[in-house]
């Protein structure tokens, strides 16, 4: 009877000995409030806003540029989270099956080009929808990750691999190299701007340092990359996103959102700069919401000297300010 007791005790000793030993003398991770200002500046100045790239006027002497964009995520959010629920997949299927055709019909009705930021996995899952987007009114397909992964959770090498893989997938599917990127979840790592430059992209649309187009700085140095800034106020997710199992359960009337977006447009028009909307087919494509978007388009078109354009065309025009 004593032998099992002895063996159990021996096993416990071995296991305890294998555990890491922590002492009060070990150096603890430095806390943010202990950082000196040099380190703080180094961190915050990795990626900053440079000069304003708003031209004196947009093409055709337009006063304001309007960029409608749609992040066509489809099933990738659920796939990224390894939530393989048919219920969640059906929401992504709705985006492809119903919403994208509705959006394309609206854009065609009002003769408006738009930009679609699409994860590469969405491109592979829904080739017919991608083909329809490309064939209609020169709409743009921009990068939006491989499977809607968060860049800040990846190593630099893993982020590089997925960005290159996404770039080649979009290029192969559309016959055209993508000109720009909107990072999934607007998530920017310490390596993202470096990798954008490696790919030869001309613009990003993920950051929030201005309302106007601006040049990105990397460690204080101009990069030549145009930023077309985004803002949660001008995104449909905060108003229409819904999570069954969390506190994200907004219930906002579409026309209340219309008032917010119309007010934002009016100020952009007054300032003579840029108006960027970020939308998602799985949210904006529902009946009452696509009707609201149509009302917004009609409202914008009552104004003179408005240039509706893709992100690529806006970035190319703004980039002239850098090159001149």
Protein language model regions, located:
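Bacterial N-terminal signal peptides that target proteins for export
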Residues: 1-11
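Bacterial N-terminal signal peptides
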Residues: 9-20
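Boundary at the C-terminal end of the N-terminal hydrophobic targeting segment
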Residues: 21-25
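Active-site-adjacent pocket scaffolds in enzyme catalytic domains
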Residues: 29-59, 168-172, 176-271
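Active-site beta->alpha N-cap acidic-glycine motif
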Residues: 33-137, 147, 259, 299
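Residue-level marker for buried hydrophobic side chains located in beta-strands
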Residues: 66-68, 141, 307
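Metal-dependent polysaccharide deacetylase catalytic core of the NodB/CE4 family, i.e.
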Residues: 101-104, 108-189, 223, 229-246, ...
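C-terminal domain-boundary segment and adjacent tail
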Residues: 109, 203, 215, 255-324
């Amino acid at each position: 009877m004593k032998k099992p007791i002895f063996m159990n005790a021996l096993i416990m000793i071995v296991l305890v000995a294998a555990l890491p030993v922590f002492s009060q003398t070990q150096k603890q991770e430095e806390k943010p409030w202990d950082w000196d200002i040099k380190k703080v500046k180094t961190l915050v100045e990795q990626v900053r806003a440079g000069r304003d790239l708003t031209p004196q006027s947009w093409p055709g002497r337009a006063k304001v540029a309007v960029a409608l964009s749609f992040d066509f995520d489809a099933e990738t959010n659920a796939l990224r989270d390894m939530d393989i629920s048919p219920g969640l997949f059906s929401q992504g299927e709705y985006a492809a099956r119903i919403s994208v055709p509705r959006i394309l019909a609206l854009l065609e009705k009002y003769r408006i080009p738009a930009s679609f930021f699409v994860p590469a996995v969405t491109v592979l899952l829904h080739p017919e929808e991608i083909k329809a987007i490309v064939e209609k009114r020169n709409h743009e397909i921009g990068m939006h990750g491989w499977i809607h992964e968060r860049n800040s959770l990846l190593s630099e090498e893993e982020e590089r691999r997925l960005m290159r893989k996404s770039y080649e997938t979009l290029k192969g599917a559309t016959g055209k190299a993508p000109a720009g990127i909107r990072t999934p979840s607007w998530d920017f790592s310490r390596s993202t701007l470096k990798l954008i430059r490696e790919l030869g992209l001309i613009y990003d649309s993920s950051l929030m340092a201005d309302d106007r187009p601006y040049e990105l700085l990397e460690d204080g140095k101009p990069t030549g990359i145009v930023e077309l800034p985004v803002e949660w106020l001008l995104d449909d997710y905060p108003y229409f996103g819904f999570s069954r199992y969390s506190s994200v359960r907004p219930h906002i009337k579409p026309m209340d959102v219309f008032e917010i977006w119309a007010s934002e447009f009016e100020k952009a028009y007054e300032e003579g700069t840029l108006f960027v909307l970020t939308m998602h087919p799985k949210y904006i494509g529902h009946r009452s919401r696509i009707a609201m978007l149509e009302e917004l388009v009609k409202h914008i078109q009552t104004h003179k000297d408005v240039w509706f354009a893709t992100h690529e065309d806006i970035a190319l025009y703004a980039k002239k300010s850098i090159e001149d």
